[in-house]
């Protein structure tokens, strides 16, 4: 599924950890490339949702890559299941290495959406020297679930790790009915429900990040919609407040919902991302 078929990008894959085939899309920079952006989608998403974003950034001189995490999009693996968010981070690592090899010497930025933001943060903690900056969009650090429910899921993940327990509503991702209709018709996310183990591992990754935000030193851009029902803007505020980076920016979008780059008003969000990257490429 690509909301903008004229900007689908070229499809590729590489052998990831455990031999799984990891799919990704790539968009070549228009003219001489100035930098690189690697995109990490979250739940109810995949690389196909970033065609319009990537084509615009490519026109601005960026080589853009978007990964399908294992078990998602067109990548191999049990659907939506993960043993550890470290496995997702290994998928990101594989794509980053490919992007660096194809664009030697260029600054590389990493953008993660929602759960993809958690993955991006986990990856960044171990690879800050390779990155020029981190962009976290609708960061899934705090979610609208009580602590006791999260604790129960962590326990259940040991007993029934493959049980599917969390289904996000597509209508909470965008106020644009065209986007929601496209999501509803997308076979790659049809009936997407997260297994107990996946949800528990995200909670464990968030626990780790809580102790590690002060270790971030690279430039960070944090974006969140005030009406996001899938993740809490307070989580992005917490990241901003505790990040060790001296170059950090928090942008809240009044009235926007979960998928900022596919929501009404997405043009302003992309303009802000583009301006932020441009300012650091000078």
Q: Predicted regions: what is each one?
A:
Residues 54-77:
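Conserved alpha/beta-hydrolase
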Residues 113-194:
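Alpha/beta-hydrolase-fold enzymes
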